[in-house]
Amino acid sequence: MQNLLDPTFNGMPGSEMYRAEVFPELFPHQKPMLLENWSQDDLEQYVGGVFTPGYGQRRPT
């Protein structure tokens, strides 16, 4: 069984982000996983709702 600290995950995109959640002192350059740290494009694509421009102006069909 592998865990997040196994060398298998070294260099994989996002691995340091998850490691920083467990050991923040070892990865101080990583931002916490909060919506406030997401780009506007990612918020629109993956969250939607109030993060999508024009959401409040929708008209019922």
UniProtKB/Swiss-Prot annotation:
Top-rank taxon, per record: Viruses
Entry-linked InterPro entries: Gp52 (IPR035344)
One Pfam family from the record: GP52
Protein name as it appears in the record: Gene 52 protein
Record organism: Mycobacterium phage D29 (Mycobacteriophage D29)
Gene name of the encoded protein: 52
